[in-house]
């Protein structure tokens, strides 16, 4: 019987799974829409929803709890400044999962997980300026 089994293991050890959700949640907060496999999207949804709920509550302790789960300072700032205000009226249900067909290489079922009422301009944002050594730039 499957009583008390709360999460999928996704064929990963616990540390790998934790890192996967940290990276995917940071990407979802940054781009507000990502494409992944359906089981990963279904497992990511409660992880991100809890982060947004922490951000809505605000406060230093909730910010530290979110930082422990997210590990990305810039996305934490976006989470607490932008997303908390955007979803202040909404009681849960901050994400949407849309099935997106099958991957050609291995026929894995794909899904798009996105934030509800998302910012269309956030999709495809780059990671910021690339670090360039000024000495090499001055010689050119």
UniProtKB/Swiss-Prot annotation:
The keyword Ribonucleoprotein applies. Keywords: Ribonucleoprotein, Ribosomal protein. It comes from the Bacteria. GO terms for biological process: translation. The keyword Ribonucleoprotein applies. Coiled coil: none annotated. HAMAP family: Ribosomal_bL17. Part of the 50S ribosomal subunit. Contacts protein L32. Belongs to the bacterial ribosomal protein bL17 family. This is Large ribosomal subunit protein bL17. The lineage of its organism: Bacteria, Pseudomonadati, Pseudomonadota, Alphaproteobacteria, Sphingomonadales. The gene is rplQ.
């Amino acid at each position: 019987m499957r009583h008390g089994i709360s999460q999928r293991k996704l064929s990963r050890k616990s540390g790998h799974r934790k890192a996967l959700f940290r990276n995917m949640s940071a990407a979802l907060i940054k781009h507000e829409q990502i494409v992944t496999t359906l089981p990963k999207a279904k497992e990511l949804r409660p992880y991100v929803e809890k982060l947004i709920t922490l951000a809505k509550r605000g406060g230093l302790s909730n910010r530290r709890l979110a930082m422990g789960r997210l590990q990305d300072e810039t996305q934490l700032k976006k989470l607490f400044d932008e997303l908390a205000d955007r979803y202040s009226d909404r009681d849960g249900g901050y994400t949407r999962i849309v099935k997106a067909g099958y991957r050609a290489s291995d026929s894995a079922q794909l899904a798009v997980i996105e934030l509800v009422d998302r910012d269309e301009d956030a999709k495809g944002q780059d990671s910021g300026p690339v670090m360039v050594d000024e000495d090499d730039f001055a010689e050119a």
